[in-house]
A protein has these predicted regions:
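A short, charged helix-loop
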Residues: 23-28
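Catalytic cores of Mg2+-dependent Asp-rich isoprenoid enzymes
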Residues: 10, 15-18, 22, 33-48, ...
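Short, small-residue-biased leader/transition segments that mark boundaries at the very start
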Residues: 2-6
């Protein structure tokens, strides 16, 4: 599957990162790892590698890499929180199922971690000179992502319906 466009492009380094991190993600989940930071890391590293390719300038590239890392962390956690009840029902791996917290405490902890990650994304975004789509990126990071976190606090049936 990863052989799609990135493999056919001029980005062999990103391809190697993706392959290694996808293998690492599978291994962590198969082992039943409970460390949320470790579990977020492969997705974070993949998005960091992807965003770092958007600039040739070293300083900007480093900021984009950090933004990508944080975005990947957000994606992994938000997806896990979104799938928590379904994964519990089907016996699938979910990092939040590894916690012994009650569901409401778990949601509060996840919310705090997600909002902290979003705050760091905003700080990284502030370091970039946005040439294109600045207002759109600002809206997504500062409004859209926090709204999604709040929506994930609701039971699945009360969440806004999204097309899959």
């Amino acid at each position: 599957q990863r052989q799609m466009c990135i493999r056919d492009s001029n980005y062999p380094t990103a391809d190697a990162v993706f392959a290694g991190e996808m293998d690492r993600q599978r291994a962590l989940e198969a082992a039943g790892d409970t460390n949320l930071d470790e579990l977020c890391e492969p997705t974070a590293k993949m998005t960091a590698a992807m965003l770092s390719l958007l600039s040739e300038e070293p300083g900007e590239r480093r900021v984009l890499e950090r933004l990508g890392y944080l975005l990947g962390r957000y994606i992994y956690m938000a997806d896990a929180l979104d799938d928590w009840e379904k994964d519990k029902k089907h016996g699938d791996f979910n990092p939040f199922l590894q916690c012994e917290d009650e569901p409401e405490a778990l949601k509060r902890h996840a919310r705090a971690s997600l909002l902290l990650t979003i705050g760091e994304m905003g700080a990284a975004l502030d370091l970039l000179e946005l040439r294109h789509f600045g207002p759109i990126l600002e809206n997504i990071i500062r409004l859209g992502l926090p709204q999604t976190v709040e929506e994930l606090q609701l039971p699945p049936k009360q969440r806004r319906k999204r097309e899959k």
